[in-house]
Amino acid sequence: MSQSNSNVQISKIAGREPDTSMPACEPVFWRVEGSLLNLTAVRPVGFFAWNSQSFLQRWTRRGAMATLAIARPFLYVTDRVFATRLLHTVLRGVSRDRLDLLGEEFFEYFLKPRLKARGIAKLNEAVAAGGEIILVSQGLDHIMRPLAKHLGVARIISNRLDFREGTATGRLLEPVIRPRGAFARFTQGQPDGRLSREKLIKVLGFEKNPEVMDEAIQPAGRPAPNVYVPVVHFESRNGRSSLSVRETLRGKNVLLIGATGFIGKVWLVNLLTDLPDIGRIYLLVRHNRAATSLQRFQRVIEESPVFEQLAERHGDRFAEFLRERIEVVDGDVSQPDLGLAAEAKQRLARSLDVIVNSSGLTDFNPDLRDALATNVRATAYTLDFLRECDRASLLHLSTCYVVGQRDGRVLEELPRNYTPCGIKDYDALKEWQSLENHVRETEARAESPEVTDELRRAALKKEHAAKDLQGAALENQIRKNRVRWLRQTLTDAASHRAMELGWPNTYTFTKSLSESLICNFLDANPAAAIAVVRPAIVESSLEKPFLGWNEGINTSASLSYLLGTFFRQLPSTETKCLDLIPVDLVSRGMTLISAALVARRHETVYQLATSVSNACNMRRSIELTGLGHRKFYRAQNGLEHRLRLKFDAIPVSKTRYKAFSAPTQKAIVQAINRTVEPFASRPPLARQQRELEKVIKLISLFEPFILHNDHVFEAANVDRLSAALPTNERADFGYDARALDWWDYWINVHIPALRKWCYPLIEGRQPEARPRRSVPLETRAESSAAEAKGATPAAAS
């Protein structure tokens, strides 16, 4: 991501406008063709056409160019403007996103090596003389912008395509910059490309309307999205007065549950960076057999890149800084009283102002026992603890996709006993108890003689097992099989029940159950201050803790990885929105909502999403993912990378996917394996069959989010909080999803972040190794004192 684009995007999200003012001086017009490059209009258009998204589009446009090649010389002689217009009709249907990326690529790999040194020297002389250079070219702005950036030029005159909904109509905008004459290459090849205003008007054929010259001058920077969605703010019970985050959270104590997670770590760093006057930050961390809670958190601090900049800022005092600001509390959110010791529980209940529960099991279809413990039981125990606190409020992190499998606009509301299917007599509390009972019954059934016999037969069925497995070895294998059987049975039961009620997976089902518990709690305790925060799909950071941070493979990483292979046909609905949001934008929202909770100016539900204010549909998401991969592969060497450039994924219907993609390919591979099975010791295409099965399973897992359920998530409540910020706090705490430039974010931030932090995990590798920091949070005296008290060592309060 270019520094200029990054600064513009970050400035807009923070609520401040970037400086785009131009110097007030007489400009110098500089013709690119002849002085800097020998550039024709045909070659870049041909490059764009040959690199269209689909194979059909490539050959269709190639054929159109071949046809034009016959007629264009005659048209060029009679009317150069019309010939130029006709040439660019070939690009009808190409997206602006693709043209912008291909324009950068064409300049970097084709034009940049061919720049004329003498012409650049002359241009630098003109710049040194104090004149503002305006590049003039017959080429499209998609090519001229990278050239201008390379030369440090701020404005250009070039041809521009008309776009409708991000797609080229094939029509050139006025004024059309006509090519030079037929012999200009031989008569106008001097390195000095300066033209007077009068001569340029004549050369371009603007004599009748010289005023169009000023209209033709455009900024050289890539235009940022101008997304404006009017929001009407009605007066509410909370009023419209200013909300200062710094003043509201000054001296306030926070308990963060889930500090070792993706969102939790980013929010913790933001608190430590942007709120120096906040009170004590307590972190609830569970110990394990190998490490105390403090040791676990210390390892996160020492190994996670999230804390690098904070560590560099404080240097040798980093550990001391953390001990002053943070206290690690041993506990377990899935246990009664949050697993806290009695003394710690009483102390926290008296002192806390905000509890932030960002814990959660994010696997789509986990073991039901794990899902209930982390997503449901943990919420119930957190609410019990909240009831015993003197003044604490609760920020509960959920997900937008608790809405389940239904279409339409999703309001910021907390319905009672909600199911996507609209079951009238559904009771969330009874459903939870039923699931807990099912777990106990299944655990008991796993020990039954019937299941044990089944597991024994399975153990002995394997090749050579009858003679190799006997006595203790056989019993040990049965025990392992029982663990797998129990896990698989409960996983299947949970996902089946979720789909039966209208949720796509266990994760969204159990997250919705936790919201129902909160709704019931608010009915019984109307004075309780609770905000349910629903982010959409949380992805790579835009600014904090640094540009392009991501972690894990539970969101879009696996799907985008697939689109970077030779896989081409993704079943999806083109107009459906894929609702992504950067993790640091979620963090900003959480900080705003925490302040609103403390000030008792909160709403019950906040959705942090982009589908209303800055939608990015599936068609565009798929193409941007492919363009992000293309930019990486184009910079690599090797035949495989060059081949992958040609395999852009495209959105297709489910019918076409089944007929021409992974399902049919799997059927063919299976048929081959069955045919040769009698003649081979093992199927020759067994690995390919397994890979195709993985692809089919992955597509099935993501179908609810890319093919079905067209959701539009309202997100007005957090916008109102951001609008209430005082001017001097908008840079640090302002929230504006409308300022996201999806092209820049996807290609220059998100895909590179996934490639750096997530794809290695998919490939069975570790992300790039970084030197481990030494951050001794636990002093020897503190450790001895904690052990003497029989408590888990933690930072001193």
Predicted regions and their residues:
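Metal-dependent phosphoesterase signature
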Residues: 82-117
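Active-site neighborhood of HAD-like aspartate-dependent phosphohydrolases
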Residues: 15-75
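Mid/C-terminal beta-alpha module of Rossmann-like enzyme folds, strongest
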Residues: 596-704, 709, 720-738, 752-796
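Conserved Rossmann-fold NAD(P)-dependent oxidoreductase catalytic core, especially the SDR/UDP-sugar
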Residues: 349-350, 354-358, 365-373, 377, ...
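C-terminal cap/substrate-recognition subdomain and adjoining C-terminal extension
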Residues: 2, 11-13, 23, 101, ...
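Conserved Rossmann-fold cofactor-binding substructure of NAD(P)-dependent oxidoreductases
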Residues: 305-354
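N-terminal Rossmann NAD(P)H-binding glycine-rich loop of SDR-like oxidoreductase domains
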Residues: 246, 252-274
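A conserved pocket-lining segment of Rossmann-fold NAD(P)-dependent short-chain dehydrogenase/reductase
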Residues: 484-505, 544, 548-585, 589-593, ...
